[in-house]
Amino acid sequence: MKLNIGDTAEITRTIEQSDVQAFADVTGDHNPIHVDESFAQTTRFGKRIAHGMLTASLISSVLANHLPGEGSIYLGQTLQFVAPVFPGDEITARVTVTEVREGRGIVKLETICTNQRKETVIRGEATVLVGAK
C-alpha cells in the first residue's frame, strides 16, 4: 500500500459501561472512578469515566484495520488525555499520515479522538511499521 502525507482513516464507536467493566477486568485496573458510580459521584467528574487507555485503544483499531492496515506494527505512541470520556460517549478515532519514511516502511501519524460534540479527548502521534500488504 502506498501511503501519502494527508491520508486519513477513522472509526466511530460508542463507549458503553460494559466496555469499561470488561477493560477493568482484562487489565486489572479497577480504579473506582471507572467502576463505582457512588465513588465517581464524589469526584470532579461527578460520574464514572472510561479508562484513558480504553479510549486510546480505538486508535490501534484504526491502524490495524484501515490505515496503514493489516500487518502493521505499532512502534510507538504519544498520548495526551485532554478531556474525560463518559460511558455513552460516541468516540471517533482518526489517524492522519504526517510523515512517510520511504524505504524503511515507517510512517508517523497524528492520532486524535473526539467525542460526539467534536471535542478532542485524546491527541498524540503514532509511529508504525507498515505491513507487507
Residue ranges, per PLM feature:
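HotDog/MaoC-like acyl-thioester-processing domains
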Residues: 1-5, 85-133
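Catalytic strand-loop segment that frames the active site of acyl-thioester-processing enzymes
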Residues: 1-50, 132
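Short, intrinsically disordered, mixed-charge
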Residues: 25-29, 64-68, 116
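Proline-rich low-complexity regions
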Residues: 32, 68, 84, 130-131
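Hydrophobic beta-strand-centered segment that forms part of the acyl-chain substrate-binding groove
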Residues: 42-50, 57-94
